[in-house]
Amino acid sequence: MRFSWKNICLPISCINNTNQKKTTTTNPPKEKLLLLSRQTSVPSRVYMSDFSNSTISLNDFSNSFFINIHIFTYEELKTITQGFSKYNFLGEGGFGEVYKGFVDDSLKTGLKDQPVAVKALKREGGQGHREWLAEVIILGQLKHPHLVNLVGYCCEDDERLLVYEYMERGNLEDHLFQKYGGALPWLTRVKILLGAAKGLEFLHKQEKPVIYRDFKPSNILLSSDFSSKLSDFGLATDGSEEEDSNFTKSVMGTEGYAAPEYISAGNLTTMSDVFSFGVVLLEMLTARKAVEKYRAQRGRNLVEWARPMLKDPNKLERIIDPSLEGKYSVEGIRKAAALAYQCLSHNPKSRPTMTTVVKTLEPILDLKDIQNGPFVYIVPVAGVSEVHEIKCKDDVKVVKEETEKDAKVFPRHRAGRRNRRKHKAMRSRAVYSDTALYKSLGTSLYNPAN
C-alpha cells in the first residue's frame, strides 16, 4: 500500500500547484497545519518540540524565522533537473536520491544564479517526513560557513524535496576511502576536519543545543577549495541545557559512529557528537573505515583496534595512513592522535567540548615540521622497457614505470594466462603534494578561518 504524506499533519504549509486540475469539490476547506503555539513573545528560533495544535500561516512562519528560503513547486524542480534525469543523478542516501540542477533569477525573483543539489526524499514510511522537517527547520534558520546552505524546499501533495547549494568536490568519504584524485594531503585533512568541528561547535553553542547525531565522512561535503560543510540534518534533534537529562528510547545513527552511552542507555548529549567526531578523526589518521566487516574479528571495529595505540608513539606510526608516505607533521599527528583519544573516551564527561576541539586543531595547520620533497605520481605505461623521471613545473615528479616486457622476450604464442596476468598493467596511484594544491587553490587551503 502506498504511503500518503497527507495522512500526516504538516508543520509547514504545503503548497498546491495552481496549474493542477481543479477537483470536483466545491469550496474545499482551508488546510490547517500544526505549527508553533502562539506566544506573547516571539521565540528566537523554532524547535521541533515547540509544535502544538495552534496554527500559523506560512508567510508568518517563513518571514519570522526562515532566512532566504525559497519555496519551489515540484514542476520547477523537475525542470531544473531535466526531469530528474539519470545524467544529473549525484547519488543516493538513506533518505532519498540527489540530483544536480541549476537555478537563477528567472526561476524565482531574488534567487542567486548557482548550481544546486536537489534531494527527493523517499515516501515509504512516516520517518522520512520527520527527517525532511528537521532539515527545513534547522537549516532554514541556522546559517554558518560550515553548514550546507539550504536554498529552499518543495512540499506539494506527496512530494518532499530539499534544495541545497551544490558542493563541487562531493563528500569526504569518497576522497578518504576511494581516493578520488589521489590521497588527501595531511594539511588538507586537517583543514576539512577543522571546518567540520567549527560546524559542530556552532550547533552545540545554540541557546538550545542542536545534537547532530549523524557525524560521518559521507555527511561532510567539500567545496572546490576543500572547505567543509555539514549536511544531512535528518537525524538532528534539539538537546537540553541540562545535558544529563537527554534520554531517548530510539537509537538512531550509523554503526561505528554512535557513542557507547547512547547505544546502551539512550543518553544523547552534545558529547555524543564529540565521540562521533573522534571516530572520523581516527578515520582521517588511518584511512580505515569505522567498521570493516571483512577484517578479522579483532580489527573490525576501528575504535577498539586503534584507540589503545593512539598514546604510544612507537605504535602510532603503524596505524597512520600509508598513502601519506610520511608527508605529515609528526607533532601534528601526535596532537591529532591525542585529541582523538580524548574524544573517544567511554566517559562522556572526559571528552572535550567542540570549542576545545577547534582550539586544538587550529595550531596544527601552522606546524612546519612536514618532510620536504614532492609526492610521487606513478604512471603505468605499457611497452616501456626502462624507467623515466620527468620534472614538472610544480615540482611534482612523474615516473613512468615499466609494466610490460619486450615482446621478443615473451613471444605472443608463449604468453599464456599466467604470463598475461603477470604483466598486466599496474593500477595507477596518485598522491598530490600540499605544495601543488597550495599553488592551484591559493592560500585558502591553509586558512584556519575558513
From Swiss-Prot:
ATP binds at residues 90-98, 119. Pfam families: Pkinase. InterPro entries: Kinase-like_dom_sf, Plant_Ser_Thr_Prot_Kinase, Prot_kinase_dom, Protein_kinase_ATP_BS, Ser/Thr_kinase_AS. It is an enzyme of class 2 (transferase). The active site is at residue 214. It catalyses: L-seryl-[protein] + ATP = O-phospho-L-seryl-[protein] + ADP + H(+); L-threonyl-[protein] + ATP = O-phospho-L-threonyl-[protein] + ADP + H(+). It comes from Arabidopsis thaliana. This is Putative receptor-like protein kinase At1g72540. Disulfide bonds: none annotated. The modification Phosphoserine is found at residue 218. Belongs to the protein kinase superfamily. Ser/Thr protein kinase family. The modification Phosphothreonine is found at residues 73, 254. The modification Phosphotyrosine is found at residues 164, 262. It comes from the Eukaryota. The keyword Transferase applies. Its EC number is 2.7.11.1. The lineage of its organism: Eukaryota, Viridiplantae, Streptophyta, Embryophyta, Tracheophyta. GO terms for molecular function: ATP binding; protein serine kinase activity; protein serine/threonine kinase activity. Keywords: ATP-binding, Kinase, Nucleotide-binding, Phosphoprotein, Serine/threonine-protein kinase, Transferase. Residues 84-365 form the Protein kinase domain.
